[in-house]
Amino acid sequence: MENVALPLFYQGMNRRKRNALALEYLDRLGLKDWAHHMPNEMSGGQKQRVAIARALITQPQIILADEPTGALDSKTSVEVMQILKDLHKDGMTIVVVTHESGVANQTDKIIRIKDGIIGSIEENLNHNASIFGVNGGAMK
């Protein structure tokens, strides 16, 4: 919980209020029961959700998600991408940086950058596809 509440500490919020908000955000991400666990007791997906809660707690206008599924198993990757999609549906701007085409293909727009130069910008009409292909099956 302290990890999620940390940005509010730097904003000068009192401990009681920041802990209450941290617990609320952990609950939204399905981690309320894990609020007092240490990071070494959590899975990669749980840690990623903690990071998302920490990013959201200050109610930013934009989230920069750098390789949000990089160290996750396939099931947890789908869950994390669904969280990001839900946030986007709620009006938040999400910028996903990834090397994985399956992750990029879930976004509304794909901007390809090579050597620091924008190569192409594409509207992604298939952005509702699963991370593992249009039909949701595992890629072969």
Regions found by a protein language model. Name each.
Residues 38-48:
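Conserved ABC ATPase signature
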